[in-house]
A protein has these predicted regions:
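Short beta-strand segments
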Residues: 20-22, 73, 144-146
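Active-site His/Glu-centered metal-binding helix of metallohydrolases
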Residues: 60, 173-174
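N-terminal "arm"/small-domain region of PLP-dependent enzymes with the aminotransferase-like
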Residues: 1-46, 51
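Solvent-exposed, non-membrane alpha-helical residues enriched in polar/charged side chains
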Residues: 35, 39, 57-61, 80, ...
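PLP-dependent aminotransferase-like
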Residues: 84-173, 180
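Phosphate-binding glycine-rich loop
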Residues: 42-93, 106-111, 116-119
Length: 183
């Protein structure tokens, strides 16, 4: 009993929780394959840059119809490395979406830049490209659209904006690996 709160106000309807994601069920479908891969890595002792990583990178590049793929520890690391490769750093601004995993803004912050959040399109939940130019300042160095739910952001207008203003585009595709723009 909660002191001072009448019991009528403490009633909670019986609600069955909705699981965020069932990793146990997902894991069960590929458990044998994972165990075999882990055993191969332990047997080879090649924990970094070994044959398994090289094979994964080739497979991922082929899956994404890309010339190259580079395996890193996480999507966050991929974004940080991409920002650094684009020479984004302290004092710079990167326009991105607020509707994303916290790592998107966190990666921008990690390199010393400031995330500038632009609203999303209500039908796709992706970056509203019409708001990008109005959010730009002289410190804007890049635009980081986030491809969500396997659906790519509207890239054509972003490419035009980037070319016209000398900006880098760094695509956060962590939630849309294999997604195709107008494909």
């Amino acid at each position: 009993m909660v002191e001072g709160v009448p019991s009528a106000h403490r009633h909670q309807p019986e609600v069955e929780p909705v699981p965020f994601i069932d990793l146990v069920a997902q894991h069960a479908t590929i458990e044998t394959e994972i165990q075999e891969a882990v055993q191969r890595v332990f047997a080879s002792q090649a924990f970094l840059l070994g044959d398994e990583v090289a094979e994964f990178e080739c497979d991922l590049a082929e899956y994404c119809d890309s010339r190259d793929a580079i395996g890193v520890a996480s999507g966050t690391d991929a974004l940080i490395l991409s920002l650094r490769a684009a020479d984004v750093g302290p004092g710079d601004e990167v326009i991105t979406s607020p509707f994303t995993f916290f790592a998107t803004g966190g990666a921008i912050h990690q390199v010393g830049a400031k995330p500038v959040f632009v609203d999303i399109e209500p039908h796709s939940f992706n970056l509203d490209t019409e708001q990008v130019e109005t959010a730009m300042t002289e410190r804007t160095r890049a635009v980081m659209p986030v491809h969500l739910f396997g659906q790519c952001a509207e890239m054509e207008p972003l490419w035009r904006i980037a070319v016209r203003n000398g900006l880098s585009i760094i695509e956060d595709a962590c939630q849309a690996i294999g997604g195709e723009y107008r494909g």
